[in-house]
């Protein structure tokens, strides 16, 4: 029997056109979330088969965890769907990282679902680089936790960032990139749904 699948389509930008990435330094909160609204067309494919995340890393590989949440009446993540995190790995370069979760048999909730990405502050995920302040010759060392998660520009916001006071919605951002200027920067994540 052939398996029927369908993919959510929130991002119509090709990988080469994605120029903005969510990147986190050490000691910062490292969780971002994307909301997927339930649509009637998902009725015949109710199971989440794959989670597809646009990642970028300068390391050979970088690990991250995926959590899935139901939403509360205020539009925030509230009920954890998967009891343990889905450990995932991004590989060097800018690429779509596909995570198959067929075995978990998770149904797409009728009130929608949050896909949460948690970056891990471990030595293997730390990327160090040198930089200089403008007008100063002094060389400094910086570091970020990888992978970075891609974002596409949109007039509608669907992304949350976890901060010291809990989840907050992303805001319209000023950007030097014309395509991203005065737009929301939404996480480039898709779900592939299946009928079994």
Which residues are covered by each model-predicted region?
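Beta-sheet-rich sandwich/jelly-roll-like modules and their strand-loop junctions
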Residues: 1-71, 118-196
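Aromatic- and Gly/Pro-enriched, solvent-exposed loop/edge beta-strand patches characteristic
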Residues: 63-139
């Amino acid at each position: 029997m052939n398996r029927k699948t369908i993919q959510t389509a929130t991002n119509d930008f090709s990988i080469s056109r994605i120029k903005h990435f969510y990147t986190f330094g050490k000691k910062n909160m490292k969780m971002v979330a994307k909301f997927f609204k339930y649509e009637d067309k998902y009725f015949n494919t109710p199971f989440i088969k794959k989670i597809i995340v646009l990642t970028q890393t300068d390391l050979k590989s970088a690990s991250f965890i995926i959590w899935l949440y139901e939403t509360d009446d205020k539009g925030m993540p509230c009920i954890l769907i998967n009891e343990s995190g889905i450990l995932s790995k991004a590989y060097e370069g800018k690429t779509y990282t596909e995570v198959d979760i067929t075995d978990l048999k998770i149904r797409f909730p009728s009130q929608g679902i949050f896909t949460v990405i948690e970056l891990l502050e471990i030595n293997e995920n730390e990327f160090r680089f040198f930089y200089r302040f403008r007008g100063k010759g002094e060389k400094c060392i910086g570091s970020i936790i990888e992978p970075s998660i891609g974002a596409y520009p949109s007039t509608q916001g669907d992304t949350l960032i976890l901060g010291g006071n809990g989840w907050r919605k992303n805001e319209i951002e000023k950007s030097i990139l014309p395509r991203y200027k005065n737009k929301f920067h939404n996480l480039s994540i898709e779900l592939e749904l299946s009928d079994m």
